[in-house]
């Protein structure tokens, strides 16, 4: 982990005007400029070609093919001991009207290795990535070194879409040094040195100056009433991401109890016996409700279980009205009072039975509907439907083709080995045939001489 800093000047130190110094801001330990291939092409290189600003200007500009790779560190905006640097570079065409590029330096040349790799976002082609290795000396006798460069360039689609025809004006180069042959490893990162960070003044964390204001700014005109209304409205909103609250069923039960209490208050003045009967009925209904499994309550629609309660309240209100009508002439005579009391008790009992039957009918309504509407058997098709195979994605097709290519290469090698073994066997048999033929000729000569 090296000490990294960001130079503010846009030109290399050699091109800096006299009398001006480059102001560097150190990055905090652990922070490195390590973007992905897609970010390098679609953000940094694209904005450089189009002349748009970037949020964190960490890539310097240099003619990379006019300098040796070990001399490029001084032109980097990230002053670090890590063996990895990023640069913008203008391409130098070898011929004016050709497509070949001149990648030769004073003491060597950059040689492309392998095929150019595509940089895609899903199926959209963003750019191309070329891998080059630095060779010291002159071709074709150059000596391979451990300096590697990844050259990123835009494709014509990106530039035509933005109305720019100079896609080859700049390329983005990532230069790094490997200690051994093979894929790059973590040895490009310099070790951490604690003495370099004795004072953390001026340490920068990229993006730390971005402040997100999650709360709205206060209103200066002093409309307190409007603010209170907005807050109350925001509290009354229901968040669909929150789990169902357990207080919703309790509110309904408390509402039901309050409603029953309000319905029973007039009957306290009319008849004490009727009040006792209704109180027992209410307790019995509450016990039945507690014994039943709790019904699911929807948070978005709290009025889901209310139709049953409204039905019960309507039946009880009708019974209360009947009882009040029956007890209007309570003071007329003793016989009338006794008859009205009997009628009130019977009506309240009938109302209770009606409410209980309504509960049973409501709970069994779904079962009866299912019994009344049996499922019709499906008619068999005359012809079986062909199985629908899912469409394979382009990535799966590419993987299948790669597997087939690998399998074909393995089979080809196997055939080569079998052919070589067959040729060896044929040569052995041919030598045996020649030996037998020669022996046969010698035997013929001996027989002829003996005769």
UniProtKB/Swiss-Prot annotation:
Disruption phenotype: The double mutant nac050 nac052 exhibits early flowering and increased H3K4 methylation on specific genes, thus leading to their derepression. Impaired pollen development. Impaired RNA-mediated gene silencing. One of its GO terms (cellular component) is nucleolus. It is found in: Nucleus. Residues 1-21, 255-337, 370-400 are annotated as: Disordered. Residues 256-270, 370-384 have a biased composition (Basic and acidic residues). Residues 272-292, 398-446 form a coiled coil. Keywords: Coiled coil, DNA-binding, Flowering, Nucleus, Plant defense, Repressor, Transcription, Transcription regulation. Signal peptide: none annotated. This is NAC domain containing protein 52. It comes from Arabidopsis thaliana (Mouse-ear cress). The lineage of its organism: Eukaryota, Viridiplantae, Streptophyta, Embryophyta, Tracheophyta. The gene is NAC052.
């Amino acid at each position: 982990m090296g000490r990294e800093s960001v130079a503010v000047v846009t030109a290399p130190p050699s091109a800096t005007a006299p009398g001006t110094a480059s102001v560097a801001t150190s990055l905090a330990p652990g922070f490195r400029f390590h973007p992905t291939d897609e970010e390098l092409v679609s953000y940094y290189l694209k904005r450089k070609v189009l002349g748009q600003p970037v949020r964190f200007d960490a890539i310097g500009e240099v003619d990379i093919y006019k300098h040796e790779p070990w001399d490029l560190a001084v032109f980097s905006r990230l002053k670090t001991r890590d063996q990895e640097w990023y640069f913008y570079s203008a391409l130098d065409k070898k011929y004016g009207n050709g497509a070949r590029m001149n990648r030769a330096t004073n003491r060597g040349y950059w040689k492309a290795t392998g095929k150019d790799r595509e940089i895609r976002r899903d199926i959209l082609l963003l750019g191309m990535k070329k891998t080059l290795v630095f060779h010291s000396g002159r071709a074709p006798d150059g000596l391979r070194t451990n300096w590697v460069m990844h050259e990123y360039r835009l494709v014509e689609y990106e530039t035509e879409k933005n109305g720019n025809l100079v896609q080859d004006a700049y390329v983005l180069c990532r230069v790094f040094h490997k200690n051994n042959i093979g894929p790059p490893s973590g040895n490009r990162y310099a070790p951490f040195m604690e003495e370099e960070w004795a004072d953390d003044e001026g340490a920068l964390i990229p993006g730390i100056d971005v402040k997100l204001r999650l709360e709205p700014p206060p209103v200066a005109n002093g409309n307190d009433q409007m603010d209170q209304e907005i807050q109350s409205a925001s509290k009354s909103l229901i968040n669909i991401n929150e789990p169902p609250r357990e207080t919703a069923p309790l509110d309904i039960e408390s509402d039901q109890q309050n409603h029953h209490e309000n319905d029973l208050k007039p009957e306290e003045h009319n008849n004490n016996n009727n009040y006792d009967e209704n109180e027992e009925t209410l307790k019995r209904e509450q016990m039945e409700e507690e014994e039943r499994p709790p019904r699911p309550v929807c948070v978005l629609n709290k009025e889901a279980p209310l139709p049953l309660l409204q039905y019960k309240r309507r039946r009880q209100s009708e019974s209360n009205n009947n009882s009040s009508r029956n007890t209007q002439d309570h003071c007329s005579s003793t016989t009338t009072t006794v008859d009205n009391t009997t009628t009130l008790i019977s009506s309240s009992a009938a109302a209770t039975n009606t409410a209980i039957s309504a509960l049973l009918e409501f709970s069994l309504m779904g079962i009866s509907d299912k019994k009344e509407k049996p499922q019709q058997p499906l008619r068999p098709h005359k012809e079986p439907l062909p199985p629908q195979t899912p469409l394979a994605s382009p990535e799966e097709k590419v993987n299948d083709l790669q597997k087939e290519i690998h399998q074909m290469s393995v089979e080809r090698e196997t055939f080569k080995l079998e052919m070589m073994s067959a040729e060896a066997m044929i040569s052995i048999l041919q030598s045996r045939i020649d030996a037998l033929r020669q022996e046969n000729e010698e035997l013929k000569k001996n027989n002829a001489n003996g005769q």
